[in-house]
Amino acid sequence: MARHWADFQYEIYLNGMTGAVPRLPTDLTRLEEMAEQRLGPGPVGYVAGSAGDGSTARANRAALERHRIVPRMLRDVHERDLSVEVLGRSLPAPLALAPVGVLSIMHPDAESAAARAAAAHGVPFVLSSASSTPMEEVAEASGDGERWFQLYWAKDREVTRSFLRRAEAAGFTALFVTLDTPLLAWRPRDLDQAYLPFLHGVGTANYFTDPAFRAGLAKPVHEDPNAAVLHFVNMFADPGKTWPDLAFLRENWDGPIVLKGVLHPDDARLAADAGMDGVVVSNHGGRQVAGSIAAADALPAGGGARGGPRAVPMVKG
């Protein structure tokens, strides 16, 4: 009989017969509290903080809580199959690890640890452009695991082109393009700590190892790290991008392209018109815009847009 996803709970109980208990709490609220106790205010605020007054993050949770499960009884569920097909790939469950940057502020093994965990369970790992570890090293840690690459779309076309070539060579099979970060959000928890990890050279590994990025520096990164950081800040995002610019990505990426941060059904239609393969209905976990519509509330409209892209994953943040 195939192993079910929830079999691990029985392992916990069986281990308890020898006096062993889980090393970490299984309650996510307690796990978050433990993380806040062990990490400094800067990392915690950066990971858990929201834009403005936090209203979008609260709306995300409230919207999900409004969607309730209605169980049905006396159904044959001895064989439970959660597998789905996404972007032409068969996945064991409708689950992927979303891109999270600067993971070294949370764990010393950063993105490599997350990639190994995803591969061990057969779920895709989406690597952030703003990772603490170069994409080639993360790909090696992922092994044969399904891996996708998230792009923060830089001003410099040559840097973007270089990122796409490197990601393809490293075995990343799909491209997720974040659209909802044309500018840095107003995040009070970060501002109150004056903490932005990129200014400390964290989350810049893909840039500092990129030949096109380094070509724009007067000195090597190790000789003038501050100049490298300023160059990164100046070219990280481009608020002037518009829909026709997507043609550049299609010309330079052979695999599926998914647009992350779509909330309006008209934008889902525009994505389809531009030849995109999917959208992620997301508000960046409330990190970018205070007062935004909740992702779960946008999902029916964005996912149901006639003529929209086929694949519509959703993240809460």
Residue ranges and their predicted role:
Residues A51-G52, S129-T133, K155, L263, ...:
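Short beta->alpha linker loops
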Residues V47, F125-L127, W148-L151, V258-L259, ...:
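Short catalytic-loop micro-motif centered on adjacent basic/acidic residues
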Residues R68, S83-E85, P94-A98, P124-V126, ...:
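Short, conserved beta-strand segments within well-ordered enzyme catalytic domains
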Residues V102, R116, A141, E158-K316:
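Alpha/beta enzyme core
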Residues A96-V102, G145-Y152, L230-F232:
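Short, basic, glycine/proline-bearing loop/turn elements
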Residues L91-T133:
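Glycine-rich active-site/cofactor-binding loop and its immediate structural neighborhood
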Residues A119-T160:
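A gly/proline- and charged-residue-enriched helix-loop-helix capping module
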Residues M1-G88, A194-K241:
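An N-cap/entry alpha-helix motif that binds or orients negatively charged groups
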